[in-house]
């Protein structure tokens, strides 16, 4: 198997996962398209823009790795890619509606382009793919399971399709099958780790501060606080 074959399989896996998510939610398909409140739209935009603006220096650091680290540069870059994937799981965890991760990550891509990301307009597509696959993790559970393992899965799935265009953009397709598998694995682990470490603490901190009033996570935090007072 060559690298092209590998990424055809990866793309097929992504499509199958999306199909499974659809089938698991097909009986509630009427509720899948849910409108967002103005506050939720603002939250998704702000999360995406902040992560995107901060992601541009991260991308520059990745370029530095690839310039001075030779064949290991892309792998080193993969280890910090989890930062790019945070806006999807974070927005989804706060809002808890289908599409929140996709919208936030797409806004992330827009912000990266406007803030001078050295990788150019490619990051727009990358942002959409990251968010779409992040959404799939929550879709598997009907957008009803918001536990830490599912948050980790959301971060891990983000690069599954996103790495495909980047491999050809950065020209590492010729590095071989094993190299590309390792790069994908590192990105998935990085996505999971960043999600586990950052998503819930940030979301709960924002809820306690009253910044995300009217969202699902704010309601959950309010109930937890009330329960603690009653206890």
Which ranges hold each PLM region?
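Membrane-embedded alpha-helical hairpins and interfacial helices in multi-pass inner-membrane proteins
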Residues: 1-10, 59, 67-73, 144-231
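Hydrophobic transmembrane alpha-helices
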Residues: 2-91, 204
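Short helix-perturbing small/polar motifs within transmembrane alpha-helices
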Residues: 17-23, 37, 43-48, 125-167
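Membrane-helix interfacial "entry" motifs
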Residues: 32, 36, 40, 73, ...
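Hydrophobic alpha-helical transmembrane segments
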Residues: 41-45, 82, 86, 98, ...
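Aromatic-anchored segments of alpha-helical transmembrane domains
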Residues: 48-55, 106-115, 155-165
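Transmembrane helix-loop junctions in multi-pass membrane proteins
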Residues: 54-65, 98, 111-117, 165-169
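Interfacial aromatic-anchored transmembrane helix boundaries in multi-pass membrane proteins
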Residues: 106-135, 169-170
């Amino acid at each position: 198997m060559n690298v092209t074959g590998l990424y055809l399989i990866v793309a097929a896996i992504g499509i199958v996962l999306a199909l499974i998510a659809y089938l698991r939610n097909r009986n509630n398909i009427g509720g899948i398209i849910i409108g967002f409140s103005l506050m939720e739209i603002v939250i998704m935009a702000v999360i995406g823009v902040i992560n995107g603006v901060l992601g541009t220096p991260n991308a520059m650091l990745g370029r530095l790795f690839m310039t001075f680290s030779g064949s290991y540069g892309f792998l080193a870059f993969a280890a910090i890619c989890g930062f790019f994937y945070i806006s999807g799981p974070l927005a989804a965890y706060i809002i808890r509606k289908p599409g929140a991760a996709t919208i936030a990550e797409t806004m992330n891509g827009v912000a990266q382009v406007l803030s001078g990301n050295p990788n150019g307009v490619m990051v727009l597509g990358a942002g959409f793919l990251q968010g779409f696959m992040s959404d799939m993790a929550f879709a598997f559970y009907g957008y009803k399971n918001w536990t830490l393992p599912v948050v980790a899965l959301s971060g891990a799935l983000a690069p599954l399709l996103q790495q495909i265009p980047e491999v050809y953009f950065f020209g590492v397709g010729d590095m071989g099958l094993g190299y590309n598998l390792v790069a994908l694995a590192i990105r998935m682990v990085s996505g999971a780790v960043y999600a586990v470490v950052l998503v819930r603490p940030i979301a709960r901190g924002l809820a306690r501060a009253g910044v995300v009033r009217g969202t699902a996570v704010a309601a959950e935090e309010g109930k937890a606080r009330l329960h603690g007072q009653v206890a």
